[in-house]
C-alpha cells in the first residue's frame, strides 16, 4: 500500500521544522529493495515508525494523523532520507514527565529495521529541539569534577592518564589490587575492563577492599589523588545498586574518587538511566561493548557510533568511549573526531544537523583500544586538544620497565604534544617516553623511522 500521500510531505523545509521546535528530526541512509519506489518505501518506513500499519484502519482519526511522522527530504542517489517525528509521539515518564531514550529508539530505530521492503536503513544523525533537551537528564557530573579531585584547573584541566587492568580476566584479588597499585604510582585513572565484576575467582567483596587499600597507598606514596571506575553492570536494577552501594561503603571518605561503569549498549538505556538517577554524585562511565554490531561502517542497519555517543549525552553519561579515531587498534577514522566534538561542546555541526545543547553538561570522550605513548601525539594533533580520559591497558602494562613507567610515558606523551616538541628529541630527555619506543618497537618503526639510531638503541 502506497502511503506517501499521508506520511510524506516534501514541501516541508528543514529550517522551518527546526525553528518550530516541535519535532525530532532523524537522518538515515536508506535503500529500498528492488521493485519498490523510493518515496513509497520511505513513507512506509515513516508509517511503521509512528502511527501507521500495513492497511487502513477504521480507528484512525484526525488527531492521530496530526502526530504522523513525515518524510520531508529524500535523495535516492545518495540514499538520504530524513523524517520529522512530532514530540507528542514519544513516551513520557509517569513519575516526572521526562523523555525516555527507549521510546526514541523504539520509534526511530525499531520495527523499521526489519521491514520487508527495505534493503537497509541506518540512522546517521538526529536533531533534538530545545524543549526535548530540557526533558532529558543529561550528565550530572563531567570531567571538570575529576579535574577538581586531581587538583587541576576545572577548565582545560588536560589529559587524564588511565588504564584498564590487564589481563582482562584471570587475575585473583591480590594480583588485581597489586596491578592497580603499580599503575597508580604513575597514573590517574583505572577502570574495570567490561567483563570484570564478581567472578568466582575474584569476588567483588574480596577484591574491592584491596583495590581501595591500593588506592590509599598510592595516594600516600605520590601525594596525588587517584580515580577508580568500577563496573556495576548487571541484568537487574537491584544487583546494580547492590554493587554500587557496597562500593560507596568501601570507599567511604574517598567515594568522590569512585566512578561507576555501565555497559550501556549491551545493558540498554535503562541501565544508564538507573545509574544516572540513583547515583548523580558519581561520574557515570559509559562503556559501549558490543556496539560494533550496529555501528560499524560495514553494517548497513542500525545507527552510527556518532548517534550512539549523542544519545549517551542525552541519557546522562559523564563520559563515553569514542574509539581511537584510527590511531589505535579499533575500527575508526580521523574524521571520527566529530563524535568527540558533538558530546563535549555546547553546539556543533554533525553529519547532517547543527545541534545546540543549551547548557547541558558535556560528556567526556574516553579514548581506549590499542593506544600507547607513541600513538598519542598524533591522536592529540588530530583531535586538537587533550581534555580526554585515555585508558591504555597494553600501553601501560606492556611498558618494558613497569606499569608506573607506562603511565608516566603516557603523561610525557601529552606534554610532548602540548609543547609542540619533536617526539624523538623529547624522548632524549624523558626516560619513560624513550623506553616506550623499545616497548612498542613495531609502532616505533612505523611512526618514527630511524628511531633506533637517533636514540642510540640497537636490536
UniProtKB/Swiss-Prot annotation:
Q: Which family does it belong to?
A: Belongs to the RuBisCO large chain family. Type II subfamily.
Where on this chain does substrate bind? 111, 168, 288, 321, 368
UniProt-annotated binding residues for Mg(2+): 191, 193-194
Q: What is its EC number?
A: 4.1.1.39
Matches recorded under InterPro entries: RuBisCO, RuBisCo_large_chain_AS, RuBisCO_lsu_C, RuBisCO_lsu_C_sf, RuBisCO_lsu_fd_N, RuBisCO_lsu_N_sf, RuBisCO_lsuII
Q: How does it assemble?
A: The complex is approximately 350 kDa when isolated from either T.denitrificans or R.sphaeroides, suggesting a homohexamer or homooctamer structure.
What is the taxonomic lineage of the source species?
A: Bacteria, Pseudomonadati, Pseudomonadota, Betaproteobacteria, Nitrosomonadales
Where in the sequence is N6-carboxylysine found?
Answer: 191
For the site labelled Transition state stabilizer, the residues are 329
The Gene Ontology biological process annotation of the record reads:
reductive pentose-phosphate cycle
Does the record carry rRNA-binding as a key word?
Answer: no
Signal peptide range in chain numbering: none
Specify the protein name: Ribulose bisphosphate carboxylase
Q: Which top EC class applies here? A: lyase
Q: What else is known?
A: The basic functional RuBisCO is composed of a large chain homodimer in a 'head-to-tail' conformation. In contrast to form I RuBisCO, the form II RuBisCO are composed solely of large subunits.
Query: Which reactions are catalysed by this chain?
Result: 2 (2R)-3-phosphoglycerate + 2 H(+) = D-ribulose 1,5-bisphosphate + CO2 + H2O; D-ribulose 1,5-bisphosphate + O2 = 2-phosphoglycolate + (2R)-3-phosphoglycerate + 2 H(+)
Catalytic residues as annotated in Swiss-Prot or TrEMBL: 166 (proton acceptor), 287 (proton acceptor)
Going by the UniProt record, its keywords in alphabetical order are: Calvin cycle, Carbon dioxide fixation, Lyase, Magnesium, Metal-binding, Monooxygenase, Oxidoreductase
Amino acid at each position: 500500500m502506497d502511503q506517501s500521500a499521508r506520511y510524506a510531505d516534501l514541501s516541508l523545509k528543514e529550517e522551518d521544522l527546526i525553528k518550530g521546535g516541535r519535532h525530532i528530526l532523524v537522518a538515515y541512509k536508506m535503500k529500498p529493495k528492488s521493485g519498490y519506489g523510493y518515496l513509497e518505501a520511505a513513507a512506509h518506513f515513516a508509517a511503521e515508525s509512528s502511527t501507521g500499519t500495513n492497511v487502513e484502519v477504521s480507528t484512525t482519526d484526525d488527531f492521530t494523523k496530526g502526530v504522523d511522522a513525515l518524510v520531508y527530504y529524500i535523495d535516492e542517489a545518495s540514499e538520504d532520507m530524513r523524517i520529522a517525528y512530532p514530540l507528542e509521539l514519544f513516551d513520557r515518564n509517569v513519575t516526572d514527565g521526562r523523555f525516555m531514550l527507549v521510546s526514541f529508539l523504539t520509534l526511530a530505530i525499531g520495527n523499521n529495521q526489519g521491514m520487508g521492503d527495505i534493503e537497509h536503513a541506518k540512522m546517521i544523525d538526529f536533531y533534538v529541539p530545545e524543549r526535548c533537551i530540557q526533558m532529558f537528564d543529561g550528565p550530572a557530573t563531567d570531567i571538570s569534577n575529576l579535574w577538581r579531585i586531581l587538583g587541576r584547573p576545572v577548565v582545560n584541566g588536560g589529559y587524564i592518564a588511565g588504564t584498564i587492568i590487564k589481563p582482562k580476566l584471570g587475575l585473583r584479588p591480590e594480583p588485581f589490587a597489586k596491578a592497580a597499585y603499580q599503575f597508580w604510582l604513575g597514573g590517574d585513572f583505572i577502570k574495570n575492563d567490561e567483563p570484570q565484576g564478581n567472578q568466582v575467582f575474584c569476588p567483588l567483596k574480596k577484591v574491592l577492599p584491596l583495590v581501595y587499600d591500593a588506592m590509599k597507598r598510592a595516594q600516600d606514596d605520590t601525594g596525588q589523588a587517584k580515580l577508580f571506575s568500577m563496573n556495576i553492570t548487571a541484568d537487574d536494577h537491584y544487583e546494580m545498586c547492590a554493587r554500587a552501594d557496597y562500593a560507596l561503603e568501601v570507599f567511604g571518605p574517598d567515594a568522590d574518587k569512585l566512578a561507576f561503569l555501565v555497559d550501556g549498549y549491551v545493558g540498554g538505556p535503562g541501565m544508564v538511566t538507573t545509574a544516572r538517577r540513583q547515583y548523580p554524585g558519581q561520574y557515570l562511565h559509559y562503556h559501549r561493548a558490543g556496539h560494533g554490531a550496529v555501528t560499524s561502517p560495514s553494517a548497513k542497519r542500525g545507527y552510527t557510533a556518532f548517534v550512539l555517543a549523542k544519545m549517551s549525552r542525552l541519557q546522562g553519561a559523564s563520559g563515553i568511549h569514542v574509539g581511537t579515531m584510527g590511531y589505535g587498534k579499533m575500527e575508526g577514522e580521523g574524521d571520527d573526531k566529530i563524535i568527540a566534538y558533538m558530546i563535549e561542546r555546547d553546539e556543533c555541526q554533525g553529519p547532517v544537523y547543527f545541534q545546540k545543547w543549551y547548557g547541558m553538561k558535556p560528556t567526556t570522550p574516553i579514548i581506549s583500544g590499542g593506544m600507547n605513548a607513541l600513538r598519542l601525539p598524533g591522536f592529540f594533533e588530530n583531535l586538537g586538544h587533550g581534555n580526554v580520559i585515555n585508558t591504555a591497558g597494553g600501553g601501560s602494562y606492556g611498558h618494558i620497565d613497569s606499569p608506573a613507567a607506562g603511565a608516566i610515558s603516557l603523561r610525557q606523551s601529552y606534554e610532548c604534544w602540548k609543547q609542540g616538541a619533536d617526539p624523538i628529541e623529547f624522548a632524549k630527555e624523558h626516560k619513560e617516553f624513550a623506553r616506550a619506543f623499545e616497548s612498542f618497537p613495531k609502532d616505533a618503526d612505523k611512526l618514527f623511522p630511524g628511531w633506533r639510531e637517533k636514540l642510540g638503541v640497537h636490536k
